[in-house]
């Protein structure tokens, strides 16, 4: 009889540890990539896992109704620029949501199409270049493009 109680205590002890799984990852639900979910202002927070260099920035303001964007950036030039254009979203059955765009004034297409993942309700998303999976950008939602950046763009125009 003592052996049965010892055996039951051993099983209870083992089951207590078996039910606790620390390796389980919490998966946050993601939103579908639609013009409505992209609508608003997004700031480039990380590029290839690194924060942006001091003095550089990129803000993208998406307009869901017109399917247009305004990009305020100081990235590839010493002057701030506002670049405008239109965007498209395609749901590829193999890649997921692919975002592409065209610049206004005949300036061509974006350099890459981007696979958009991890669009969180909390306000972040990840873009990976479709043809270069080492080009990864993380964007976070913000209320607006800072006034000083808009002023800097107007001075430089």
Model-derived features: positions:
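Sec-dependent signal peptide recognition
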Residues: 2-10
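C-terminal motif of bacterial Sec signal peptides marking the signal peptidase cleavage site
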Residues: 15-19
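Bacterial signal peptide processing site
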Residues: 21-24
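N-terminal helix-cap/turn-to-beta initiation motif at the start of protein domains
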Residues: 26-43, 157
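Short, solvent-exposed loop/hinge segments that bridge or flank secondary-structure elements
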Residues: 39-67, 102-110
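N-terminal glycine/threonine-rich, aromatic-flanked beta-hairpin/loop signature
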Residues: 52-98
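Edge beta-strand at a domain terminus
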Residues: 82-92, 128-157
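An anionic, turn-rich surface loop/hairpin at beta-sheet edges
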Residues: 95-118
